[in-house]
A protein has these predicted regions:
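Single conserved hydrophobic/aromatic residue that forms the stacking wall/gate
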Residues: 1-10
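Extracytoplasmic
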Residues: 18-20, 60-62, 155-162
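Non-catalytic substrate-recognition and accessory regions of acyl/acetyltransferase enzymes
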Residues: 11-18, 52, 56, 68, ...
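Periplasmic OmpA-like peptidoglycan-binding domain that tethers envelope proteins to the cell wall
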Residues: 70-171
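Acidic/histidine-rich, surface-exposed loop or edge segments in extracytoplasmic proteins
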Residues: 15-31, 104-109
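Periplasmic peptidoglycan-binding/anchoring modules of Gram-negative envelope and division proteins
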Residues: 25, 29-97, 126-130
């Protein structure tokens, strides 16, 4: 990728901050409250946005929140129950391998594909941020879901990643 000069960065006035936690979830799990790594990550995000970043989050600022939920390659046998804790998703848009697609996960559908599991992991992050990161209550937030399904099995592939892009960050 071409390197960007500092001038470009200042022109764009974008702050881009990425947070990541690995080995977040038990196999088949999607509840972020049951994952120590995920909850540590959520606390780091909350502290950052209510601390250092709060000065960039004036009312009406646009913030893009790109949340990537990942699943490993372990096949889902049968169906994992979904309790609806993060809402019901019908034709929810998401990106996988750079392509826009859509996905449905409801209490009645349950979870039969790793993509659905990965989406719910991302949805848990979305839910936490909306409920707990108070400084994002007055900004215009655009959430985007990305889903990754690894070709390998293992805890390190069951993870979440959150990227925040604050537009016009340096304008008062």
């Amino acid at each position: 990728a071409p390197s960007r000069g500092l001038g470009d960065v200042y022109k764009r006035q974008v702050i881009n901050k990425e947070f990541s936690a690995k080995e977040d979830f038990p196999s088949g799990g999607y509840n972020i409250e049951k994952s120590n790594a995920a909850m540590s990550l959520m606390k780091i995000i909350k502290n950052a946005f209510e601390g250092d970043f709060s000065k960039y989050l004036a009312e009406g600022k646009q913030v893009k929140v790109i949340i990537t939920g990942s699943a490993d390659a372990s096949p889902i046998r049968g169906r994992i129950a979904y309790d609806g804790r993060y809402g019901e998703f019908t034709d929810e848009p998401y990106y996988k391998d750079g392509n826009l697609d859509n996905i449905t996960v409801t209490k009645s559908s349950g979870i039969t594909q790793n993509e659905q599991l990965a989406l719910l992991r991302a949805a848990g992050v979305h839910s936490y941020i909306e409920k707990n990161v108070t400084t994002l209550n007055n900004t215009k937030n655009d959430y985007e879901y990305h889903v990754e399904v690894a070709k390998e099995r293992g805890g390190e592939f069951r993870k979440i990643n959150v990227e925040f892009v604050i537009m016009d960050a340096f304008q008062q």
